[in-house]
Amino acid sequence: MASNMEVFCEILIAILLPPLGVCLKRGCCTVEFLICLVLTILGYIPGIIYALYVIVFQNREGSTELGAPLNSA
């Protein structure tokens, strides 16, 4: 699991240069990177939103916390 500082740095990079943030997280030859690049070219704000989505929400795919019950007895 990434530390809070790592996630903060990834989010900061995603806000400044959205395709770079996705490239560092997923790789440069991925569909996520190409989508982020196109969205950033068409409009800077959609690129930022998509980059944040990739970094924050797709980061938790392998996490067991997301689907775990609150009270496990």
Swiss-Prot record:
GO BP: defense response to fungus
Membrane topology: Multi-pass membrane protein
Alphabetical list of PROSITE patterns matching this protein: UPF0057
UniProt keywords, alphabetically: Membrane, Transmembrane, Transmembrane helix
Zinc-finger found in the keyword field: no
InterPro entries assigned: PMP3 (IPR000612)
Protein localization: Membrane
Transmembrane segments: 4-24, 37-57
Transmembrane helix keyword on record: yes
GO cellular component: membrane
Broad class of where this protein is predominantly found: membrane
Similarity annotation: Belongs to the UPF0057 (PMP3) family.
UniProt-recorded name of the protein: UPF0057 membrane protein At4g30650
